[in-house]
Design a protein with these regions (language model features):
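Short hydrophobic alpha-helices and adjacent helix-cap/hinge residues
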Residues: 1-191
Length: 191
């Protein structure tokens, strides 16, 4: 859904950059899902891999000038050096969309992801089933049911987007998610 959001708020986007540590299996899995989502939406995904947080600045710079937006997943290595990505995106006027709502205030345009506390609450019944003896293989996989969309209005204004038109595009995005049976809570930062 993050890439649907990118299409909604950066409609001219053709190429999206992403940074991740290929040694983190969760990041590789997420990146594979990102590739599929981009294909479905007609976006080209340009990847920059990193081995440590020290690599993040140069990796982000390698994407500048080649992408219309940058997406950062919950990759531990990249998120630990998010300030470097923010510096590059700010210097190059590239919208930054992230998957971790707790970090949007660092300088991303928007974040779409789950609330870790609520996700823990959703997981509790599963843990109880396991503690009562049910095999994990007998329990269906669940994804976060509710998402939070955090918008950084300071960045909206900095990149010259009309706050009201931005709100309209975000509202239509949230409505689409809700029509699909999901829920999106929109949280505005910087007003």
């Amino acid at each position: 859904r993050q890439f649907q959001l990118i299409k909604e708020i950066v409609p001219q986007a053709k190429r999206v950059g992403t940074l991740y540590n290929a040694a983190e299996i969760n990041s590789v899995t997420t990146n594979n899902l990102a590739k599929e989502a981009c294909e479905e939406l007609g976006l080209e995904l340009l990847e920059a891999t990193v081995s440590s947080s020290a690599d993040v600045f140069l990796a982000a710079q390698s994407l500048a000038g080649r992408v219309d937006a940058i997406y950062v997943s919950t990759d531990n290595t990249t998120v630990s050096a998010l300030d470097a990505v923010v510096q590059v995106t700010n210097e190059n006027d590239i919208p930054l969309i992230i998957a971790d709502p707790t970090t949007v205030e660092k300088g991303a345009l928007a974040a779409l992801g789950f609330n870790y506390y609520q996700h823990g609450r959703q997981t509790t019944p599963i843990v109880i089933k396991i503690l009562k003896g049910k095999k994990p293989t007998e329990i269906p996989v669940e994804f976060a049911k509710n998402l939070e969309l955090h918008i950084n209005m300071d960045i909206v204004r900095e990149i010259g987007i009309s706050p009201s038109s931005f709100r309209d595009s975000v509202s239509s995005f949230a409505k689409k998610i809700e029509e699909e049976g999901g829920q999106v809570e929109t949280i505005v930062v910087g007003e």
